[in-house]
Amino acid sequence: MAKMFDLRTKIMIGIGSSLLVAAMVLLSVVFCLYFKVAKALKAAKDPDAVAVKNHNPDKVCWATNSQAKATTMESCPSLQCCEGCRMHASSDSLPPCCCDINEGL
């Protein structure tokens, strides 16, 4: 019975297939990051922020679209607020401020 592939051919097929798998994984990671950044930029263009009247103009209360229509002065303290546009790196749980679309990217 004759050998179908010698050792060099098997090694070359293994290297080629591993490079193909690595390229596909890298491509999927790039697409995933692209869609995340596109979603973040789209959300930054249409911020769901409602400024509170009679308060500090630097404070912005964040709400969803349905809450933004019915937000009153009494319901605002339950929403998350941020002071100004400069936030520390330790405050990941707060929403991004709406100063610049590309800020934080």
Curated annotation (Swiss-Prot):
Query: Record's Gene Ontology CC terms?
Result: extracellular region
**Which locations, inside or outside the cell, does it occupy?**
Secreted
One matching Pfam family, short form? FAM24
Q: Which family does it belong to?
A: Belongs to the FAM24 family.
Q: Which InterPro entries match?
A: FAM24 (IPR028122)
- Signal peptide region: 1-32
Q: Does the keyword Secreted apply?
A: yes
Name of protein: Protein FAM24A
List the gene name: FAM24A
Q: Which UniProt keywords apply?
A: Secreted, Signal
